Amino acid sequence: MKLVLTEEEQFLKDTAKNFADERSPITHFRALRDNNDPLLWDKDLWSEMTKLGWPGILIPEDYGGSNFGITGISVILNECAKTLTPSPLFATGVIGAYSITNYGTEKQKEFYLPKIVNGELTTALAIDESSHHNPADTEIIAKKQGSSFIINGKKTFVIDGASADLIILLARTSGIKGDMTGLTLFLVDANSNGIDRRKLDMADSRNYANINFKNVEIPDSDILGDLETGGETIENILDIGRIAMASEMLGNAEAAFETTLDYLKQRKQFGVLIGSFQALQHRAAEMFCEIELTKSSVMGAMKAADEGSNELQRLSSLAKTMAGETLHLVSNEAVQMHGGIGVTDE
């Protein structure tokens, strides 16, 4: 496994960097947040991303995509994360595209995938029912009734849940809470009768929602994958999501580190640049080392996904864990090393 980007992947990364820097600086996201934008992402910006083909990176060419792989979509997310580019790319271009491509029926692929590629359809993955993430704790019920299922229950903290057109829902068709068997994935039209979505205001200003399902009827043709194989399927989908999220968090950490490094080279205290203080140099060096280690971990997980490695689950979990810890370290250190200006929002 070579932990380097191919020429094509590097080109994609460079394109994403230029796009994010020019079309979506951090000030763009702050404006959406401060103006209480209901979507918290820009439709015009999403349209531009669609023209670049980003929602179709994981989708086969037969359905209009480019089939560029997990590495391709991850390097885009990495660059977009550096400027906090607001978009449904993670929930739709990663989770939605991967789920339907790998587990959808031919009819489902033909219907949904071209719409994802064209930017006509956004998706959201609804799995959690409390603040604790554990798919096995699924209690929302999908009860068989003729050729349909009746859905009752709730989902919480659904990313892009307030705006998505299609909900990928994990529900229980048999068994009890805590059991990974008896779970089934469904493709649910977000505008179906009986669905109530409540947008949440979160600290990171991302688009989340709580979703209630009351006697929502969906045909059995809308099962994603096979009946009661949802436990195994969702684990694979989450592995891919972990890699994409790790790449995003790495981008956040890289941007925070670069901003801090620039500040150390400009800010003077006691008549000298604070970057000349050895204690701050040591702290900056630690951040640099952790970021470089995380890069290798994330790259390893991306390549494992594209190569179909049996180590995917382990490497994806490792990448997300390392990225989370590194981002926590760097963001905390960035605030501390900026001093008082580090806790302002302007």
Q: How does the language model describe each region?
A:
Residues 152-196:
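A short core secondary-structure module
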Residues 137-139, 189-220:
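Flexible, small-/acidic-enriched active-site or ligand-binding loops
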Residues 119-128:
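A short, Trp-centered hydrophobic/proline-enriched beta-strand micro-motif
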Residues 95-103:
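Helix-loop "lid/cap" segments that line or gate small-molecule binding pockets
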Residues 1-87, 103-108, 115-120, 135, ...:
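Alpha-helical interface subdomain recognition
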Residues 215-232:
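Long, acidic (Asp/Glu-rich), low-complexity accessory segments flanking structured domains
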Residues 102-104, 143, 169-173, 187-189, ...:
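Short beta-strand-to-turn element immediately C-terminal to the catalytic PLP-Schiff-base lysine
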Residues 53, 74-81, 171, 187-192, ...:
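Short Ser/Thr-interspersed hydrophobic loop/turn segments at strand-loop and sheet-helix junctions
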